[in-house]
Amino acid sequence: MTIQLINESSNTAKFQQICEKWQLVHDKSASLALVLTDTRLELRKLDEAKLGAIAVNFVDGTLAHRRKFGGGRGEAIAKAVGIKGNYLPSVIDATAGLGRDAFVLAAIGCKVTLVERHPVIAALLEDGLTRAYLDAEIGEFMQQRMQLANVHNIAQLDTTTQSADVVYLDPMYPHKQKSALVKKEMRVFQHLVGADLDADQFLLPAKALATKRVVVKRPDYAPPLAEQHPSFSQKTKNHRFDIYLSPLQKR
């Protein structure tokens, strides 16, 4: 991974702390840049400035609108993880990305542990969470329900002490569309990390951690993860959720 590290803020110590924590090294020839401004940490694709910057923002914008006016319990992901009545499962989001799916679940009431293996994305996610924790409206429930795990792979979680009702997987999968048709965040992500070619390896540790079910989000054209057919699937317009029930749930 190559990336430029740029500090546009007045807080040099914070910038250095981010670089050291996530073990990031500056490469002046890279076309992607991680930039700290006075308000947030953001990712820019320098050779495609029109794409704009990518940052994690739980407080306002799209996610705030989705929290206030979205489908809530009617959202496809809420149904997939099994939210029903008073039942709000604990969830490990093993491919957290920018935390959007996790935020939907947390806003409904689930406690979500986030795991993100790419250091740049994890840094963006941590920055977004830190700002959300300080917000007067959502700060309290965010601190209670959304936490970034101090690991970069779910295989590093202890199955005896860090299990959850549900493990959620949404691995990057190659898009059929030409790049110009793929939304900007996905284009930048693919440039940064590519597809999760080792995604099949996620399923076994996910099953070990999930006490009730593993939920895998897949494009409608993608095969099942690790060629293991799910217990059942829930389909949406362009995707499906493959659901693997734990042995105890099948009885």
Swiss-Prot record:
Positions annotated to bind S-adenosyl-L-methionine: 100-101, 116-117, 170
Function: Specifically methylates the guanosine in position 1516 of 16S rRNA.
Reaction(s) catalysed (UniProt annotation): guanosine(1516) in 16S rRNA + S-adenosyl-L-methionine = N(2)-methylguanosine(1516) in 16S rRNA + S-adenosyl-L-homocysteine + H(+)
Protein name (record): Ribosomal RNA small subunit methyltransferase J
InterPro entries, sorted: 16SrRNA_methylTrfase_J (IPR007536), SAM-dependent_MTases_sf (IPR029063)
Any one annotated GO CC term: cytoplasm
Compartment annotation: Cytoplasm
Keywords of this entry: Cytoplasm, Methyltransferase, rRNA processing, S-adenosyl-L-methionine, Transferase
Pfam families per UniProt: SAM_MT
The EC number(s) this enzyme carries: 2.1.1.242
GO molecular function: rRNA (guanine-N2-)-methyltransferase activity
Predominant location: cytoplasm
Family the UniProt entry places it in: Belongs to the methyltransferase superfamily. RsmJ family.
